């Protein structure tokens, strides 16, 4: 598997295999996206709720940056059309 010059589709496939991905031109060092799995949260009744959607399963793309983790990151059109993704 190549490690740089990836399309967004190739980056998604790499994340499904446990890899971290980033774009060359992102601002800030150490920023990347990865696939988060086994997602759960504590609701207002202090109950742990496991997220498990029939279509997407229990996974979401997480953006890790200088301010922490953003779960459910959404790619821009520029992100989706770029071929400058690389494996971290």
Residue ranges and their predicted role:
Residues 1-4, 71:
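Residues at structural and domain junctions
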Residues 3-47, 52, 63:
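Catalytic phosphate/metal-binding cores of nucleic-acid and nucleotide-processing enzymes, i.e., regions
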Residues 56-88:
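Short, compact, well-ordered microdomains
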